[in-house]
Amino acid sequence: MNKPESETPTVQSQRFKPIPLENLTAEQRVLADAVRSGPRGAVKNSAAAKPGPLGGPFNVFLRSPDIGNIIQSLGAAIRFRSSLPPKLNELAIIVTARQWTSQYEWFAHHRLALEAGLDPAIGEDIAQGRRPAKMSEDEAIVYDFSRELHETQGVSDATYQRALDRFGERGVMDLIAVNGYY
């Protein structure tokens, strides 16, 4: 969490070097096409929408196309088919990114959280490792559930009940899934 939020992982620091599109195998091409033609491809400036080699985690997924395709399909479902509103889903993602010091996910999803309507002050507090002071009830439920899940590897009955009362069983499952995936 010591890196500034605007800093993005560089290609030079990648352990898996980008594979030029013309060097993809048939199986890798299927995966690349699935990523680019799915909902991620419509997200402006995303790793899936940029021309050239796939970036972000998708570049790594190319090394095992069958597994990579399963993972990217799961990720697309968690991100784009969740019962949680995009702002809350992105909030869970950035809480997870900060908890695990995942610079790429923070870089990719902090902007998306703001675009989905998250107050910039909430993002700044999370970036600094602080519990945001001013959150809506829904935001507080997602924040508390996510932090507790990561810090204790479980959630208390009280935290679970708050999430269940507000989001229902599907929402709780979607919240668990987004935290686990990211």
Report the location of each language-model feature.
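Mobile cap/lid helix-loop segments that border enzyme active or cofactor-binding sites
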Residues: 2-84
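Conserved alpha-helical segments that form or flank metal/cofactor-binding pockets of metalloenzymes
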Residues: 69, 90, 96-116, 120
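Strongly charged, low-complexity linkers/loops
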Residues: 132-160, 164
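Transmembrane-helix boundary/entry motifs in multi-pass membrane transporters
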Residues: 168-169
